[in-house]
Swiss-Prot record:
GO terms for cellular component: cytosol; small ribosomal subunit. This is Small ribosomal subunit protein uS13. The gene is rps13. Pfam families: Ribosomal_S13. PROSITE patterns: RIBOSOMAL_S13_1, RIBOSOMAL_S13_2. Residues 1-64, 184-224 are annotated as: Disordered. Part of the 30S ribosomal subunit. Forms a loose heterodimer with protein S19. Forms two bridges to the 50S subunit in the 70S ribosome. InterPro entries: Rbsml_uS13_C, Ribosomal_uS13, Ribosomal_uS13-like_H2TH, Ribosomal_uS13_archaeal, Ribosomal_uS13_CS. Belongs to the universal ribosomal protein uS13 family. It comes from Methanocella arvoryzae (strain DSM 22066 / NBRC 105507 / MRE50). It comes from the Archaea. Residues 20-30, 38-47 have a biased composition (Low complexity). Residues 1-17, 210-224 have a biased composition (Basic and acidic residues). Located at the top of the head of the 30S subunit, it contacts several helices of the 16S rRNA. In the 70S ribosome it contacts the 23S rRNA (bridge B1a) and protein L5 of the 50S subunit (bridge B1b), connecting the 2 subunits; these bridges are implicated in subunit movement.
Amino acid sequence: MSEKTDKTEKKQKKAEETVETASAEAAPAKKGGKKQAAKPAEGAPADEAARKGGKGKKPAAEEKPKDEIKYIVRIANTDLDGTQTVEFALTGIKGIGNRISKIIARQAQVDPHATMGYLPPEQVDKLRAVIDNLEANVPVWMLNRRRDIYTGEDKHLYGVDLTMAVKEDINIMKKIRSYKGIRHERGQKVRGQRTKSTGRTGATVGVVRKKGEQGGAAKKEDKK
């Protein structure tokens, strides 16, 4: 009987110990029904939201500043549209077409499909350098002024130089009294177009009725 009593006493002691440990673990949970928040490490900056007791929001990610677009880019004394692509913006220069603009972009190592207004100044300077020396960067058969009258050189004119050269050529044709020069003097079409209905110059002649017709119309009105 003594052995049985010893065993029962040991079981009771173990049961009491387990109850004590369980009560000790459940003690912090009973206070307020929430676990206590862990204390921040010493020296760490405390969050304002944590001080107030609310949930803090994540700080917004810093937005990268976007490059400002230049709406007007000046190249070769011409204001170009900065919202267009490079290959189309360069065609705004008189004397430069689509094909030459693509060649200029390739020679300057600039993306022809990039927006002109977003190009850095270094790439814009490269475009200017290629345009200033087009004779070396463009095939001879693409130049717009081959075998110049005065110098005999192959050139590519653009901008104001092109307009002045065209005016000088017309003045030369007028001085030598060529057919084209005479047509330019008279303000008529130069390239053989018909002028029966279009291209007429001078004052328009109105329709004039004859005196007899006017008198007959007046008599008819009197009879009525």
